[in-house]
Amino acid sequence: MSEITDDRQQVIITLPDGSERTYSSGVTGLEIAESIGKKLAEAALAFTIDGKPRDLDTPVTENARVSIITFDSPEGKEIFWHSSSHLMAHAIEELFPGAKFGAGPAIEQGFYYDIACEHRFNEEDLRAIEAKMLEISKRNLSINREEMPREQAIEYFSNERKDPYKVEILEDTLKDVPTVSVYHQDGFADLCSGPHLPSTGKVKAVLLTNISSSYWRGDSSRETMQRIYGITFPSDKLLKEHIARLEEARKRDHRKLGAELGLFMLTPEVGSGLPIWLPNGAIIRNELETFLKAEQRKRGYVPVYTPHIGNIELYKRSGHYPYYSDSQFPPLTYKDETGREEQYLLKPMNCPHHHLIYSQTLRSYRDLPIRLTEFGTVYRHEQSGELNGLVRARGFTQDDSHIYCRPDQLVDEICNAIDLTRFVFNTLGFDEVETRLSLHDPENQSKYGGTAEVWGQAEKDVKEAADRMGIKYFIGIGEASFYGPKIDFIVRDAIGRKWQLGTVQVDYVMPERFDLSYIGSDGQKHRPVVIHRAPFGSMERFIGVLIEHTAGNFPLWLAPVQAVVLPIAEEVHDYAREVYAKLHEAGIRTELDLRSEKIGKKIREAELSKIPAMLVIGRNEQEKGEVSLRRHRKGDEGSFGVDELIARLCEERDRRF
């Protein structure tokens, strides 16, 4: 049947395609899915009521917009994996009685749970936990939500569950929440806001991937816990596809390729999360910086440089300290020659320095917009367990720009920043880009700087610019920075993984905190609006993603070595040197391999080094004044005169394709 009605009051349900259906009041999400189709009902994990996710058994008592959530959607995966973290905790509790549980969220690829347990988990334990999870799944236990007063929940987790971590959350994080929700599956229960799967039977395939250590609540002064990572799927087929992607990802791992290709290094002698660029990697980074600097110059940006440290009072004024204090290096404290104590921070953000540059002179409305740009290095004390080569580092360089404009210029400037970001991604071969409008959470206004009215205007401007640029976007409530909404660009790499890279942020808060102003046409002072903008995001993260996207097979303009001259025999070495000299003079990064190895070995080694152009020279090429061109991963492309070849390579390099 397409609709469900009885003598109860009726409700009108609007589906995602705009169609409307009539149901009896109290109809559940599952019943709505069943009325649409059997396959949808089988795939249903949860549903949304007016955009808010709910358990499938939640009754709908008023007219509403409803959407069924399946595993195919990001929301569905998050719910599936969050429920799976509970399933894993349930399995651990049965296998290791006395284990207690901290935080267990869904993450981008799966889930984890932090566990306090005297037993030290190992790989053998992971396999046992997987088996127990599948056993519990086969029981097809109902997952039921229970709401209770916070005080009752404290008593429940203190006396029945005997879980001090949940009690601490209830007494601290949720101290102002009168009613909380607990999810039960047979004898296991967990504190959670939900929603969750309707039953454990939805989970058909399990893979636990890693064990690491963590601190309770991320605080190094608190107890150490064991973190187990995993991922689950509604079918074995999806798990097999995931494992195949993991294998491909291992081949593309930027840490592995970074070492093999001599791009960067990490060493404890320098410090965790502090990458050192080796010559080949420095070439790639320099090419990217040169590319963006040239494009920014065309678009009216002016460069600045700022120090690597700053007085702590600067960051207190901006709000970065103490807002980001948990992820900052400790202040550097010393006494000057007068005995006065001063504190400095390793620069966590470039923004405050740029605001001071803007404010150092009186500005007129005619001067705006002013676009300051800097490749500025910043430092964040990321948890050691979160570090990941270049893509998550403690020291990294942002392609940071701040645009100071009048309110009437704001939407145009946002559009220009979006256009620049698109240009960068298109040039670098990121064809699939998602856009998220990251807005504030109005129910948690104290988390943000500025008033609700200021936020309303900023979010209106961001949406207007995104609509004008024809961007298809999704909304991320609670994803905004503390000073303003932002547009986040999320690229999909060659094997389908998503990476957040560039960003455009609107800021009405910092101009107030730094008392920024310009003289308007009326002769009075006015506040500018600030746009924070970084197409790359950070050079380290962007290059790390680029390495994995290309598998180290860089386009010619970025390749550290663009061509290698490979003479077949010693008798053509002099001619090979002449060819090498011409390429070098033309600005093509070239190597000359004069070793007495066989040409096949030279070619294989050049392929492994991922050099785009291999120029093979034998007696025949010398006599004709030519070279034989072999392209990386493509093979032979024929013989060319030296000047013709150089022109061909220079055109490819300069066009950046």
Curated annotation (Swiss-Prot):
Gene3D superfamilies: 3.10.20.30, 3.30.54.20, Anticodon-binding domain (3.40.50.800), Bira Bifunctional Protein, Domain 2 (3.30.930.10), Threonyl-trna Synthetase, Chain A, domain 2 (3.30.980.10). Zn(2+) binds at residues 351, 402, 532. One of its GO terms (biological process) is threonyl-tRNA aminoacylation. Its cofactor is Zn(2+). Its EC number is 6.1.1.3. Pfam families: HGTP_anticodon, TGS, tRNA-synt_2b, tRNA_SAD. SUPFAM superfamilies: Class II aaRS ABD-related (SSF52954), Class II aaRS and biotin synthetases (SSF55681), TGS-like (SSF81271), ThrRS/AlaRS common domain (SSF55186). GO terms for molecular function: ATP binding; metal ion binding; threonine-tRNA ligase activity; tRNA binding. Residues 253-555 are annotated as: Catalytic. Keywords: Aminoacyl-tRNA synthetase, ATP-binding, Cytoplasm, Ligase, Metal-binding, Nucleotide-binding, Protein biosynthesis, RNA-binding, tRNA-binding, Zinc. It is found in: Cytoplasm. Residues 7-70 form the TGS domain. One of its GO terms (cellular component) is cytoplasm. Belongs to the class-II aminoacyl-tRNA synthetase family. Catalyzes the attachment of threonine to tRNA(Thr) in a two-step reaction: L-threonine is first activated by ATP to form Thr-AMP and then transferred to the acceptor end of tRNA(Thr). Also edits incorrectly charged L-seryl-tRNA(Thr). This is Threonine--tRNA ligase.
